[in-house]
Amino acid sequence: MSHYKFETLQLHVGQEQPDPATDARAVPIYATTSYVFRNCEHAAARFGLTDAGNIYGRLTNSTQDVLEKRIAALEGGVAALAVASGAAAIDYVLQALGQNGGHFVAQKTIYGGSYNLLEHTLPGFGITATFVNIHDLNEVEKAIRPNTRAIYIETLGNPNSDIPDIDALAALAHKYGLPLVVDNTFGTPYLIRPIEHGADIVVHSATKFLGGHGTTLGGVIVDSGKFDWAASGKYPAIAAPNPSYHGVSFVAAAGPAAFVTYIRAVLLRDTGATISPFAAFLLLQGVETLSLRLDRHVENTKKVVEYLSKHPLVEKVNHPSLPDHPQHDLYQKYFPNGGGSIFTFEIKGGVKEAHTFIDHLEIFSLLANVADVKSLVIHPATTTHSQLTEEELLDQGIKPNTIRLSIGTEHIDDILADLDKGFAAVQAL
């Protein structure tokens, strides 16, 4: 179906024909733990990866399969793996690449959970990271070591929506025989497709824009199929005979889909962060309206950014659409149709003013999620990024007066009126 447009693909890929058993047009929820093999030979072929298909519910499910095919198609990859959460997706990617003493070069302005995983959790398993100013290519290159396994970035940094130069970073990674891993949660394949700019692995928290309604946890890993896992010798679990899977080389068995096949067959098999059929079904409902929702998110965001930029109680707006933003040129290059509905601004004052503003909003919900159809708000320094030291917070551009907004799809007049209420409360202090 590759000749179809995005809006058509988001509705049809993975279920081009009605369900063969029931003729259902909607994707069914296949609530089963296991699958019947025709005979012993068929079972052996499935376990040996010579016959593609369902083996056990921890690894695959037919509802999940539709979601995976759809996201892979939307991102322009060869295959995808859906798992229980975005955190699980990120962890599996980093485990697969970094095992046995690996090292990552990572953008320092990333989601706080990813930062903590790289800075504190993975070092306990012998995997380390160097955080860099991703906009300084010399600094990025100097951080690469002999045991570096990947460069890790986000299309839109969390929470300030800063933008890395994906093309340049892909070229640098490939110069050293490394894959570029891109978290495209905030970008979405509707606004940007990192694989077209040289990314090798794309990861999503599907909980956010892909699902879009704040109802469902999920994560997706997309394999571009373009990276040569055997060339450098750094990835034996993927390229060499794997002792935990009766000597199978995933490169030989799965070809361009080797990376996600390894994660499914080994890491997911052994640690079980499996997405449920119902969660996969709910995420598919979100994906079907992705383009429609994103158009409204982008439209509303432009108006909110304009409003905040002119407000006397706002010290600074951190949004790449603004001409004075340091990555404005990259925003125009990578996001010609707009983007960045999750961003921050700095209110005049400090924590007291920030909290007062947030506590007097009515439409905006104070919660930890983002990229919902409902508008959301949070104070990063005391919540999502509170595990960071003061120095780490400032290094990531998060100040005591920083407020993160996630602009929803409500009517723009109501969104702006709600922001007025917050500012009125601050003015009354």
Predicted regions and their residues:
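PLP-dependent enzyme catalytic core of the Aspartate aminotransferase-like
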Residues: 78, 101, 119, 128, ...
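Active-site beta-loop-alpha junctions enriched in small/polar residues
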Residues: 156, 185-187, 322, 348, ...
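Short, acidic Gly/Pro/Ser/Thr-rich loop/turn segments
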Residues: 18, 36-40, 228-229, 290, ...
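Conserved C-terminal alpha-helix-loop-beta "cap" of PLP-dependent enzymes
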Residues: 294, 302, 306-309, 313-403, ...
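N-terminal "arm"/small-domain region of PLP-dependent enzymes with the aminotransferase-like
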Residues: 2-61, 69-70
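Conserved PLP-enzyme active-site core in the AAT-like
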Residues: 2, 18, 80-311
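Short amphipathic alpha-helical segments
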Residues: 52, 78, 279, 283, ...
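Conserved N-terminal alpha-helix of the aminotransferase class I/II PLP-enzyme fold
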Residues: 39-91, 113-120
